[in-house]
Amino acid sequence: MTQVAVLAGGVGAARLLRGLVDVVPPEGVTAIVNTGDDMVLHGLAICPDIDTVTYTLADAIDPERGWGLRDESWHAMEALSRYGGATWFRLGDRDLATHLYRTQRLAEGQGLAAVTAEIAAAWGLALRIVPATEQPLRTMITLAENEGGAAVIGVGVAAGQEISFQDYFVRLQHAVAVSGVRFAGAEAAQPAPGVLAAIAGAEVVVVAPSNPIVSIGPVMAVPGIRDAVAARRDDVVAVSPLVGGKALKGPADRLLRELGHADSVVGVARLYAPFAGTLVIDEADAELAEDVRAAGLRCVVTDTIMRDPAAAAALCEVVLGR
């Protein structure tokens, strides 16, 4: 059975995984998922990237938003707003059940990897979904001055302030400039059970078309993971999240630029060169293929836009070298 390990985070990774399980047996697929976005809110353990992967693979994701469950209701949020509670991070009524269950199982002493496996099994998934780490790891964003140079960016938010990823991405709608990113807790983190074995045993290690800074970055910040991936460099295939120099979703292109990297597939190539042997780029960036190769990677040009599961499956065939 073909064994594939996928470093994953966000909607792009979820869509790639949806295509991958159509071209290889899902039992041979391990998704190693970013936990830097995780948070505790209303006393609940929330793992947005893990849940997006789970819901997408279960064909239960809301197709319009790209997160949460299809046909969701919002009665709990409406009731919470009456009390003046925090409703900027929207949690649907059925989605709440996932967070309630996860929080209860963690409180009972189960590790996040085991709980994630339980949730995936409950959705009928055959692939393995594992967190990058079970220890607290939080992506923290330092804000830069806005375009007008003003120090105060918004209510309670100022240049130089460090905020959580969800505050940046959801509450502020990533509409602010960034001067730094760090992964709090990374130095004390360890790869979750099964992560290193999945990387070592995979025929192909795939870096999904996720944000290089805030989706792949936290995974690679866990001690041991970057070295394990680099040891497989010839078998590591990364998919660029940029098309024509732009992110299809989210702030990947802006973050690259704001943090001093080229906001193109060349910038992605330079970030990934130490641990990836091949970069798959979109046809819109074909003129940069030689620059990618100059950065030390093989370059494959194809259609990387996953408009539907069939397009995602076709991309995965290319990623697997078929």
Regions found by a protein language model. Give the residues of each.
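Short internal beta-strands
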Residues: T30-N34, D234-L242, T278-E283
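Active-site glycine-rich loop that binds ribose-phosphate moieties when present
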Residues: S179-I199
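Redox- and metal-dependent alpha/beta enzyme cores, enriched for Fe-S-associated oxidoreductases
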Residues: M220-L259
